[in-house]
Structures are given as C-alpha cells and as structure tokens.
Amino acid sequence: MVHIEKQISDLQEKLIAVNRVSKTVKGGRIFSFTALTVVGDSNGRVGFGYGKAREVPTAIQKAMDKARRNMTTIVLNSGGTLQHSIKGVHTGSRVFMQPASEGTGIIAGGAMRAVLEVTGIRNVLAKTYGSTNPINVVRATINALNKMKSPEMIAAKRGKTIEEILR
C-alpha cells in the first residue's frame, strides 16, 4: 500500500500508510491524520518516521523529517541481498528474511517491501507472521536488519579469518 515515491538528493522516500484518527470531545469529533514513511539511500541506510497532524500534507512532512533524523546503517552483501537469514520482532509482528539468488527480486509484502526497496536490497525472500500492522512490521523489519552481521564482523569477534568463517 505504498502511495508516494519521491527522490530528494540521494534519499528515496516512500509513504507507507496514511490513517485518519479521531478524538471525541464534548462538541463532537476532532479528526487528525497520521502518516508512516520510510527513507533510504538505496545503499544500506534506512529510517522510518511516524507523523501526526490535523492535515495530511503536514503529517507526511513531519513523518519524512523524523525518518531522515532516524536513519541507521545496514551491512549489505555485494550481491544486493542479505548476509544471512534473519528474524525480527516488534510487539505482535514477527518477520523472517532470507537471502535470495540474483534475479529473484524482492518477495515481500506491504510495508516490509517498502523498507527493503529504500534500503537497497534487490534480492530477498521475506515473510510476516502475526500482526500485519504497518508500524509494527516496519519496526520489526528494521530491527531484523540491524541484527545482521557481516562476515568481517563475525571474524573479528571470533578472532578468526574471513576464509574460516565463510567455509
């Protein structure tokens, strides 16, 4: 359900969801809007933002600003895929992602697809279990991507060479 794709400088921005929410007061209802966005540089940096405002464009702008301030770096494989299979959890949402061979594409649904596209991952198999709430899926996906370790990081931690790790 990705709506808008915009490029500013080297960042790719995607709007994942816009939601109308209401607050009931003595005089009736007050409506406001929430927006969920992801921002990435297609080279391993990704961030998400959640903005709330009385009007849709303002909510989207707030979400984009928060996403740009909330960016993290992901260690990608040279083939445009993941280093290894990973799992991520956030509240009721669980995600599982595994590397895929060249030409597979992004096999993922909804909010997870948008996160993977802006991160720069080109080949991946992914599945969401449990809650498919977009906010929780985005948080679980970024949580999983942050857990990913490169062979260099694992080799340094174990005190071995990269060749020994990749065997």
Swiss-Prot record:
Record has rRNA-binding as a keyword: yes
InterPro entries xrefs: Ribosomal_Su5_D2-typ_SF, Ribosomal_uS5, Ribosomal_uS5_bac-type, Ribosomal_uS5_C, Ribosomal_uS5_N, Ribosomal_uS5_N_CS, Ribsml_uS5_D2-typ_fold_subgr
Any GO CC annotation of this UniProt entry: small ribosomal subunit
Molecular-function annotations in GO: rRNA binding; structural constituent of ribosome
Keyword terms of this UniProt record: Ribonucleoprotein, Ribosomal protein, RNA-binding, rRNA-binding
Every S5 DRBM domain range: 11-74
Paired cysteines (S-S): none
Domain of life: Bacteria
BP terms from Gene Ontology: translation
SUPFAM superfamilies (UniProt xref): dsRNA-binding domain-like, Ribosomal protein S5 domain 2-like
HAMAP family xref list: Ribosomal_uS5_B
Domain remark in the UniProt entry: The N-terminal domain interacts with the head of the 30S subunit; the C-terminal domain interacts with the body and contacts protein S4. The interaction surface between S4 and S5 is involved in control of translational fidelity.
Subunit structure: Part of the 30S ribosomal subunit. Contacts proteins S4 and S8.
Family membership: Belongs to the universal ribosomal protein uS5 family.
Reported function: With S4 and S12 plays an important role in translational accuracy.
Name this protein carries in UniProt: Small ribosomal subunit protein uS5
